[in-house]
């Protein structure tokens, strides 16, 4: 399964399963270079049809010398366009051209200093304007032992004699490290040099052009029809509604479904926001009993997500029948949602299902409109600013479509939802008062499926445990736990335990992404 957003693209990134692949696209887009990610097994004819100006081979967990290695059609190197290999991509390039790749005696993970070798001619283009001795991020267990014929070394590190290589005649380059990771000090410049200096890509990707293009596409597609827009009150769906309203005006029918899994005061805040800030008429549907009824007895997180996604569609279908002329359903699907729903191993190996991804059931009569499906989160915020939306709306922390259902471990019920809402209000109140809310990417509480013994007064308790999760991130692709002051964490814990009956223990999640994900389910 391949996700194609545009007929043509400046750069194609072939994904071999690296946890950092999406970061490659993000770094390039920061320079205004449009690119897309496709699975490594994309058909050669499909690649040629896109007419890319260059190809990037991502990193990945496999080894090129193993039987089940992720391989590509060698004809990719015969398309007459530049190719950049990153980590596994470098080993694959070495392997294909007759070099030797072997298991390293010592794995190399973390920071390393890269020294440029004597550079001449085209071999220097990758590092043009950059400085030798800068820190990069290594993450590999294999190494290149012998270069293929025609290749030369252009950089090395203490543990990697071949930290970067280049073909002496053809525009083929490869690096053993990850330039896309923020720890690589000038890594983004290497990617920029490849895209602009070597491939000759254009850097005209920006939100003004994107907005104008999408408005035109929406108008041409919708014409005299009507669009039902799924609204959650989060940044994504709010930007979708604002974009659609700009494009088609009264032909937009925005529907906010209260599925009973919202945070405290969420419904009222959403209704106020649409009325006062967006000036878009909003229809609210209370479907909490329907959702909670279908979730009864369900504890598996994947099943919960699917039930919620299917029920959303059913509710919207009922609402659509109340209005004549509705042909389309609009959703706030983002590019990471699309990518994460397609594994590099093919459609049978889905990494993670997403409630917005996968199309509509056969019984539905309207078509999907997903104007944000090629954007990352920070690009959505930039688009919102381009549309004139207020900052306080755009900078709200992300909130998942399935809501609190995936922040309650196990079965979801009304009592646990109330417990979690109360704890969440306290945590967010303390975070905002301390000034850390705007400094963090996402903050929430999780009700664990764990009870523990406690003592309150002279009485023994056996109550619930709540986990506080606060992370820092640039785009949500990677994240680190926020190093909050102990005094702040103590205030959160004390207030939650004292003010919320049924909770006697609070813990703080100090996991980063990867290896953990931001949400628990």
Swiss-Prot record:
<comment type="function">
    <text>Catalyzes the synthesis of GMP from XMP.</text>
</comment>
<dbReference type="Pfam" id="PF00117">
    <property type="entry name" value="GATase"/>
</dbReference>
<comment type="pathway">
    <text>Purine metabolism; GMP biosynthesis; GMP from XMP (L-Gln route): step 1/1.</text>
</comment>
<comment type="subunit">
    <text>Homodimer.</text>
</comment>
<dbReference type="Pfam" id="PF00958">
    <property type="entry name" value="GMP_synt_C"/>
</dbReference>
<dbReference type="InterPro" id="IPR025777">
    <property type="entry name" value="GMPS_ATP_PPase_dom"/>
</dbReference>
<keyword id="KW-0436">Ligase</keyword>
<keyword id="KW-0332">GMP biosynthesis</keyword>
<keyword id="KW-0315">Glutamine amidotransferase</keyword>
<keyword id="KW-0067">ATP-binding</keyword>
<keyword id="KW-0547">Nucleotide-binding</keyword>
<protein>
    <recommendedName>
        <fullName>GMP synthase [glutamine-hydrolyzing]</fullName>
        <ecNumber>6.3.5.2</ecNumber>
    </recommendedName>
</protein>
<feature type="active site" description="Nucleophile">
    <location>
        <position position="87"/>
    </location>
</feature>
<feature type="active site">
    <location>
        <position position="178"/>
    </location>
</feature>
<dbReference type="InterPro" id="IPR001674">
    <property type="entry name" value="GMP_synth_C"/>
</dbReference>
<feature type="binding site">
    <location>
        <begin position="232"/>
        <end position="238"/>
    </location>
    <ligand>
        <name>ATP</name>
    </ligand>
</feature>
<feature type="domain" description="Glutamine amidotransferase type-1">
    <location>
        <begin position="10"/>
        <end position="204"/>
    </location>
</feature>
<feature type="active site">
    <location>
        <position position="180"/>
    </location>
</feature>
<dbReference type="InterPro" id="IPR004739">
    <property type="entry name" value="GMP_synth_GATase"/>
</dbReference>
<dbReference type="InterPro" id="IPR014729">
    <property type="entry name" value="Rossmann-like_a/b/a_fold"/>
</dbReference>
<dbReference type="GO" id="GO:0003921">
    <property type="term" value="F:GMP synthase activity"/>
</dbReference>
<dbReference type="GO" id="GO:0005524">
    <property type="term" value="F:ATP binding"/>
</dbReference>
<dbReference type="InterPro" id="IPR017926">
    <property type="entry name" value="GATASE"/>
</dbReference>
<dbReference type="InterPro" id="IPR022955">
    <property type="entry name" value="GMP_synthase"/>
</dbReference>
<keyword id="KW-0658">Purine biosynthesis</keyword>
<feature type="domain" description="GMPS ATP-PPase">
    <location>
        <begin position="205"/>
        <end position="396"/>
    </location>
</feature>
<dbReference type="GO" id="GO:0005829">
    <property type="term" value="C:cytosol"/>
</dbReference>
<dbReference type="InterPro" id="IPR029062">
    <property type="entry name" value="Class_I_gatase-like"/>
</dbReference>
């Amino acid at each position: 399964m391949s996700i194609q957003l545009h007929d043509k693209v400046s750069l194609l990134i072939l994904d071999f399963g690296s946890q950092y692949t999406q970061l490659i696209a993000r770094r390039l887009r920061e320079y205004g270079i449009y690119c897309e990610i496709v699975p490594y097994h994309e058909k050669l004819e499909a690649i040629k049809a896109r007419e890319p100006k260059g190809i990037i081979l991502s990193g990945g967990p496999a080894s090129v010398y193993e039987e089940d290695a992720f391989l590509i059609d060698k004809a990719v190197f015969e398309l007459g366009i530049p190719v950049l290999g990153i980590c596994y991509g470098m080993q694959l390039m070495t392997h294909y051209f007759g070099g030797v790749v072997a298991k390293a005696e010592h794995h190399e993970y973390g920071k390393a200093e890269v020294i440029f070798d004597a550079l001449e001619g085209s071999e220097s283009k990758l590092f043009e304007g950059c400085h030798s001795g800068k820190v990069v991020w290594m993450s590999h267990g294999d190494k290149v032992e012998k270069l293929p014929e025609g290749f030369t070394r252009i950089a090395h590190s203490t543990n990697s004699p071949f930290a970067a290589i280049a073909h002496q005649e053809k525009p083929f380059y490869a690096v053993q490290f990850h330039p896309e990771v923020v720890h690589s000090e000038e890594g983004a410049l290497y990617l920029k040099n490849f895209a602009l200096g070597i491939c000759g890509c254009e850097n005209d990707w920006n939100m003004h052009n994107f907005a104008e293009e999408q408005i035109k596409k929406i108008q041409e597609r919708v014409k005299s029809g009507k669009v039902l827009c799924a609204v959650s009150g989060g940044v994504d769906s709010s930007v979708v509604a604002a974009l659609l309203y700009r494009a088609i005006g009264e032909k937009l029918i925005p529907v906010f479904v209260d599925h009973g899994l919202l945070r405290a005061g969420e419904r009222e805040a959403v209704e106020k926001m649409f009325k006062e800030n967006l000036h878009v008429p909003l229809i609210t549907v209370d479907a909490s009993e329907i959702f909670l009824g279908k979730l009864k007895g369900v504890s598996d997180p994947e099943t919960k997500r699917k039930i919620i996604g299917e029920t959303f569609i059913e509710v919207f279908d009922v609402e659509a029948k109340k209005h004549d002329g509705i042909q389309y359903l609009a959703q706030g699907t983002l590019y990471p949602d699309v990518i994460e729903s397609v594994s590099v191993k093919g459609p049978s190996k889905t990494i993670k299902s997403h409630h917005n991804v996968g199309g509509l059931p056969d019984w539905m009569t309207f078509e999907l409109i997903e104007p944000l499906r090629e954007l990352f989160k920070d690009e959505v915020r930039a688009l919102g600013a381009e549309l004139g939306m207020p900052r306080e709306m755009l900078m709200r922390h992300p909130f998942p479509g399935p809501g609190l259902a995936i922040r309650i471990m196990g079965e979801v019920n009304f009592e646990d939802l109330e417990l979690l809402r109360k704890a969440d209000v306290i945590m967010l109140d303390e975070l905002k008062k301390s000034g850390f809310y705007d400094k963090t990417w996402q903050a929430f509480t999780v009700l664990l499926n764990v009870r523990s013994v406690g003592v309150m007064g002279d009485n023994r308790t056996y109550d619930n445990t709540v986990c506080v999760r606060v992370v820092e991130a640039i785009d949500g692709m990677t994240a680190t736990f926020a190093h909050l002051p102990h005094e702040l964490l103590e205030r959160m814990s004390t207030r939650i335990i004292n003010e919320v009956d049924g909770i006697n223990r609070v813990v703080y999640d100090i996991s980063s992404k990867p290896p953990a994900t931001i949400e628990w389910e």
